[in-house]
């Protein structure tokens, strides 16, 4: 039996967090080109170290900082949710390239989407759970 291994030159994956959606395209390259919506990642995320570190957790985990260029399209949500959506999409893209990384990413939970979203407002209440003041008399 012949075992066929697929070789891919690029990987495109998507990720989400709250209302933020991210599409990541991972290409072999120098690693210096990380574009988010046409801007450098540091400019887009306003040089915020927390967002950038969170976003590049998968890349740092497998030590591939200088091997791949990343093109990212994000929409919706805030910067923090967008960074977390990129983290999920980047993890999925690396697993698409290298299936052996699946265990490495699964253990810290990088392949799991955070399902927490804003709870809807209910009628009779002021917010999702905040009730109007109660008066006995």
Curated annotation (Swiss-Prot):
Any one Gene Ontology cellular component term annotated for this protein: small ribosomal subunit
Any one GO molecular function term: RNA binding
GO terms, biological process: translation
Cross-referenced InterPro entries: Ribosomal_Su5_D2-typ_SF, Ribosomal_uS9, Ribosomal_uS9_bac/plastid, Ribosomal_uS9_CS, Ribsml_uS5_D2-typ_fold_subgr
Principal location listed in the UniProt entry: plastid
Coiled coil ranges: none
Keyword list, A-Z: Chloroplast, Plastid, Ribonucleoprotein, Ribosomal protein
Locations listed in the record: Plastid, Chloroplast
Pfam families documented for this protein: Ribosomal_S9
Superkingdom of the organism of origin: Eukaryota
PANTHER family named in the record: RIBOSOMAL PROTEIN S9 (PTHR21569), SMALL RIBOSOMAL SUBUNIT PROTEIN US9M (PTHR21569:SF1)
Entry's family note: Belongs to the universal ribosomal protein uS9 family.
Protein name in UniProt: Small ribosomal subunit protein uS9c
Organism: Chlorella vulgaris
């Amino acid at each position: 039996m012949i075992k066929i291994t697929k070789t891919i030159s690029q990987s495109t994956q998507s990720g989400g967090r709250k209302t933020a959606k991210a599409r990541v395209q991972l290409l072999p390259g120098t690693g210096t080109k990380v574009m988010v919506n046409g801007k450098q990642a540091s400019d887009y995320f306003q040089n915020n170290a927390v967002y950038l570190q969170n976003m590049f957790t998968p890349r740092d985990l497998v030590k591939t900082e200088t091997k791949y260029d990343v093109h990212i399209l994000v929409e919706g949500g805030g910067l923090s949710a967008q960074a977390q959506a990129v983290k999920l999409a980047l993890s999925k893209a690396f697993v698409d390239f290298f299936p052996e990384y699946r265990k490495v990413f699964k253990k810290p939970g990088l392949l799991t989407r955070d399902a927490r979203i804003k709870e809807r407002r209910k009628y009779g209440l002021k917010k999702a759970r905040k009730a109007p003041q109660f008066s006995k008399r």
